[in-house]
């Protein structure tokens, strides 16, 4: 009789910015068995060690939050060197785009194990987008939403008050563990971009907020925290004779809005050329789904996307142009006053896009309740994601 408890191998469950998730877990090179109820994240050694260190620190810090284990998947992690991947392990390995960027492929992964480590973690359930697609009934979606709101209020907001920012919240980084209607947990994962930052303390500018491309799950204004913007905008201010001694800078910049729009448009083009498109295409897809019923000409969608991004950045610049005592440009006022308070909320809200997209694709067959949710989500996206945030 065969032993049905033997775990034969792991398959790729998902891929992220730093590694690929396998379920069941991969085997460590010093063990003969695979861990049960565990998944593995195969990563370059330096990223695995970095994330493991982050998790240890986070667990020690966030454990003071009541029921923190219900909101964050940050405990019971371990790292090890991987054993040789089996044929089953290599199933769908081509989906592991993260390692492919580092020239590690299905063909050479077993000869590249010295470069890799496994981050083992408890199984936390399905990603929010997968859960939405598999569970379309109204009751389960309402339950999911209730747990999401608990995550926001009792987890994310409390964490932010402790000056800790996940910085990469999105549907694929939120897991829902649905055992039954009375036992459901929704938790944050993937803490590789976490930032610990205390505002107004003149700390080093966090590296995870510097020189970033456009991203769909953080405010567009993240692309203002670049060396290119600092230098080009400083030159713009000099050209328009705006200095630390200028009075009513905001009023003056409003009078020069047309110049600012041109400047921001040119900056975005230069930054995309320098850093790449980032998530621009996906942002355009979101805008398409939000506004296609309002705009007859599909070609106008891309124009609208550009207009939304430009307007967002222009308003930030108008309202948050400040100078340091030495007369140099000061981007910290916006970072400390606004950005840190909205970065994780932004990601949390956009995590609902898979639900909106599902309703969008089935728009003509939506019932009254679904249509109401669809309209509410659209309103929330526009209000909290795409209108410029110049106050919390």
Task: Cite the ranges covered by each PLM segment.
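ATP-binding glycine-rich loop module of kinase domains
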Residues: 17-101, 106-107
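Conserved structural core of kinase catalytic domains
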Residues: 68-144, 200, 230, 235, ...
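A conserved short helix/loop substructure at the end of the activation segment
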Residues: 384-392
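Conserved N-terminal boundary motif of the eukaryotic protein kinase catalytic domain
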Residues: 2-12
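C-lobe/activation-segment region of protein kinase-like
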Residues: 183-362
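Catalytic-loop of the protein kinase fold
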Residues: 159-178
């Amino acid at each position: 009789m065969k032993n049905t408890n033997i775990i034969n191998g792991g398959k790729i469950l998902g891929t992220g910015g730093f590694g690929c998730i396998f379920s069941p877990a991969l085997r460590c090179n010093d063990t003969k068995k695979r861990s049960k109820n565990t998944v593995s994240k195969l990563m370059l050694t330096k990223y695995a060690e970095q994330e493991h260190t982050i998790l240890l620190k986070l667990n020690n810090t966030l454990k003071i939050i009541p029921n923190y284990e219900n909101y964050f998947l940050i405990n019971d992690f371990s790292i090890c060197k991987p054993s040789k991947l089996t044929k089953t392990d290599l199933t769908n390995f081509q989906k592991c785009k993260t390692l492919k960027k580092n020239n590690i492929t299905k063909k050479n992964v077993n000869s590249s194990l010295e470069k890799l480590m496994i981050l083992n973690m408890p199984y936390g359930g399905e990603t929010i987008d997968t859960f939405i697609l598999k569970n379309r009934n109204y009751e389960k979606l309402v339950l999911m939403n209730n747990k999401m709101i608990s995550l926001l209020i009792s987890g994310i907001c409390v964490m932010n008050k402790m000056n800790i920012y996940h910085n990469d919240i999105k549907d694929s980084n939120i897991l829902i563990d649905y055992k039954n209607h009375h036992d459901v947990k929704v938790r944050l994962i993937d803490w590789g971009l976490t930032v610990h930052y205390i505002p107004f303390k003149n700390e080093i500018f966090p590296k995870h907020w510097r020189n970033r491309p456009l991203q769909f799950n953080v405010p567009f204004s993240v692309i203002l925290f670049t060396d290119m913007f600092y230098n080009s905008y400083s030159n713009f201010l000099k050209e328009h004779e705006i200095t630390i001694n200028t009075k009513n800078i905001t009023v003056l910049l409003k009078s020069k809005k047309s110049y600012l729009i041109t400047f921001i448009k040119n900056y975005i083009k230069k930054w995309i050329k320098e850093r790449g498109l980032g998530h621009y295409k996906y942002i355009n897809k979101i805008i398409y789904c939000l506004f296609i019923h309002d705009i007859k000409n599909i070609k106008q969608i891309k124009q609208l996307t550009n207009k939304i991004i430009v307007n967002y950045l222009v308003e930030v610049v108008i309202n948050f142009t400040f100078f340091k005592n030495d007369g140099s440009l000061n981007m910290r006022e916006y970072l400390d006053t606004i950005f840190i308070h909205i970065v994780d909320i932004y990601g949390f809200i956009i995590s609902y896009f898979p639900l909106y997209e599902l309703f969008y694709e089935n728009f003509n067959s939506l019932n009254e309740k679904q249509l109401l949710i669809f309209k509410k989500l659209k309103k929330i996206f526009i209000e909290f994601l795409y209108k410029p945030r110049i106050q919390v």
